[in-house]
């Protein structure tokens, strides 16, 4: 007995084993499960840090990705997904992450952050990109003059209640009347097991806006890759005409309506307002307490629509580090140099726009 006690006392008295070094790695297929376990546990991480985005982006758009992680003593301490966009028309960039509204480093300590930042910097130089972009929800390098920000995007996030009546009453009067109009007209929401109707409504909407459409296989891959965390919800009239549809992500206690669109009849039946209300109801019933209305550009109709729903805009301080470029990127529909293209695109027949769009949009990110 004395020997057991002495051994235990000696173990307690022994100095703690020093932590091992931080090491940088590229994610391999067998790392995906523990990568995602880290992302789900890390407060800094978002849905857009999940490993599934690598397959979705590479297979949908044919662009190259680098999913870096830092490990210490066999445990992941930080992650940084990156992807390269290379286009004669829109420039050459490395970003975290293209096609995602949030991104950048998600880590538990400063050593991991520094290693991941350094990896991105070295890769950007190696590739010869014009700029590196981090799409963070907060500035990661506020005191580093080599990183720049620009005021272009905002996000709209708001707490929701478990009570439908409370959520309805929180919507400002004018938009609440639109929701009630949709209810009175008998609109209904249906969860789809494929992306067919969603793509139909989405393609119809983006053509009206004059912007290229994503390939249909992109949405199908999102649904297949993220399973129950990716929902397609369509709105129909009482006689089953398609009105609108939205593809949303579920993440922790949040719902993120990400891609959506409406048919021509949507405006007359308040289809878009009803769609987001129907989604809010379903999300609240599922236990969500945050409704993330998503990113919008300042000065756009989408920005005004979300403001009219009572959501407050929060700036997204995306960060840019310049390499071969001498100016911050300006690849967005508000840029005057794209206005002629947008006017011409709106006049295309829908099948032509759906054929040409994916070849252009893969270079936008």
Residue ranges and their predicted role:
Residues 2-19, 84, 138-166, 289-365:
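Active-site/acyl-donor-binding loops of N-acyltransferases
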Residues 97, 169-178, 332-339:
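Short intrinsically disordered coil segments
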